[in-house]
Amino acid sequence: MTAPDCYTCAMEAEFDALPPRERVAYDRYWRVAHATGTSLPGWLVLLPRRHITAVHELTDAEAAGLGAWQVRLSRALRTVTGCEKTYVVQFAEAEGFAHVHFHVVPRAGDLPSEYRGPGVFGLLRRPAEQQVTEGRADDIARALGAELGGA
């Protein structure tokens, strides 16, 4: 099921043609993408592959994979980025982004205090010159994909 005017559904409809940054890893129920508009390399988004707008809409099969994906991504981010920990956050409230998605954000040891905790969202919607480039996001995606075993 897809929804018109949904960015995530539009990307899913183009799945086979997506660049590495838009399909870091995936399975039948979930797709992992590198976040767009961020200045933080490795900021990932875990997306259900069908359109839902609330966590309670997950099927049991989707829910069963959710925790495993969050842990696997956190481990892979630690290996690839050297982060001390990861944040996992879900809102799905922004205009055009009501499709449920989980931010899996690497938190480096030297991240300034103003960007820790919920302040990390200050690293999204950055000016173009501050954003992780598509090429860099693709490189990170490939490294994470290799760490995850192509899952």
Whereabouts are the PLM-identified features?
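HIT superfamily nucleotide-processing domains
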Residues: 1-151
